Amino acid sequence: MTNLAVKYKQQAQEEVQIQTPPQQMAKPKVKAKITRIEKLLYVAFIGFLLYACVAFIGNKAGLYQVNVEAATIEEKIVQQQKENQELQAEVEKLSRYERIAEVAKKHGLEINANNVKGLK
């Protein structure tokens, strides 16, 4: 072949190469490997989160129980104060002078103003 024929073949090959887009080689996907330390850290973090959740829920349950007990005690205090007021009113009613004089007459006693002592 002559030099001209070789040049023609080379030119034809270059045109074919120019016309066809170059094929890119597929790059293999590289898996990101998780190291043992990273796995340990992930497990520790998840464990800590679980512990924190359980502790939080436990504390909430404990606070609820304490609030229920406090409400019960407050209710008992209010009830006792009401009972104390009723008893104080009864004491005042029973310690009136007219009632004491009536009981004294019933038992045959006389009230002597010189001999009366105040207890209050």
Swiss-Prot record:
Q: List the InterPro entries.
A: Cell_div_FtsL, FtsL/DivIC
The alphabetized list of GO BP terms reads: FtsZ-dependent cytokinesis
Q: Name one GO cellular component term.
A: cell division site
- The answer, when asked if Aminoacyl-tRNA synthetase is one of the entry's keywords, is no
- Keyword annotations from UniProtKB, A to Z: Cell cycle, Cell division, Cell membrane, Membrane, Transmembrane, Transmembrane helix
Pull the Extracellular topological domain ranges from the record.
58-120
- Please tell me whether the keyword Cell cycle is annotated for this protein: yes
The positions making up the signal sequence are none
Localization per record = Cell membrane
Q: Which topology term describes how it sits in the membrane?
A: Single-pass type II membrane protein
One Pfam short name: DivIC
Membrane-spanning residues: 37-57
Which residues are on the Cytoplasmic side of the membrane?
Answer: 1-36
The family assignment reads: Belongs to the FtsL family.
Task: State its role.
Answer: Essential cell division protein.
> How is this protein named in the record?
Cell division protein FtsL
Species assigned in the record = Bacillus cereus (strain ATCC 14579 / DSM 31 / CCUG 7414 / JCM 2152 / NBRC 15305 / NCIMB 9373 / NCTC 2599 / NRRL B-3711)
